[in-house]
């Protein structure tokens, strides 16, 4: 593969992220599963084909849909805000600067009951099962 690296410019992400008025509009609709996901790297962009990287923003009063993956490890690094990670039914408070590791298998989700957006960087790595 000829790719050595790829730069994702932060100004491009900021332009896509939107503002708090989006979260307010969504809260009026009553569905609390709201977040923006920005894909920084898909598996096909890596040499191994096993790495996926992104940034997620969970708006105040909202949550992610939640998911499980039996063939991937996942690491979250929290950039801004506070929230609650739930994995396998166990809740953990998280804040900017925290790192959270999810083993393959358990259902996990992120909730933001606070008044500021929760932003985190995440990476999944496919493992041999």
Where are the model-predicted features located?
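A short, N-terminal "cap"/entry segment at the start of jelly-roll beta-barrel domains
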Residues: 1-50, 65
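Conserved short histidine dyad/triad with adjacent acidic residue
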Residues: 36-43, 54-70, 104
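Short strand-connecting beta-turns/loops that link adjacent beta-strands
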Residues: 46, 71, 115-116
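A short hydrophobic beta-strand segment most commonly corresponding to one strand
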Residues: 55-56, 101, 116-129
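Short beta-strand His + acidic residue motifs that chelate non-heme Fe in jelly-roll/DSBH
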Residues: 65-67, 85-86, 102, 108-115
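Glycine- and acidic-residue-biased ligand/ion/polar-headgroup-sensing regions
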Residues: 71-73, 78-83
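Short acidic-glycine-tyrosine-enriched beta hairpin
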Residues: 89-104
């Amino acid at each position: 593969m000829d790719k050595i690296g790829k730069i994702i410019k932060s100004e491009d992400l900021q332009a896509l992220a939107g503002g708090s008025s989006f979260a307010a509009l969504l809260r009026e609709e009553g569905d609390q599963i709201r977040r923006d996901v920005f894909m920084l790297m898909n598996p096909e962009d890596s040499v191994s084909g096993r790495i996926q990287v992104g940034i997620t923003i969970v708006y105040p009063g909202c949550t992610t849909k939640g998911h499980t993956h039996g063939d991937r490890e996942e690491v979250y690094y929290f950039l801004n805000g506070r929230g609650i990670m739930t994995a396998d039914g166990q809740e953990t408070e998280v804040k900017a600067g925290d790192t959270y590791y999810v083993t393959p298998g358990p259902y996990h989700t992120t909730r933001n009951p606070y008044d500021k957006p929760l932003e985190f960087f995440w990476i999944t790595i496919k493992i041999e099962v």
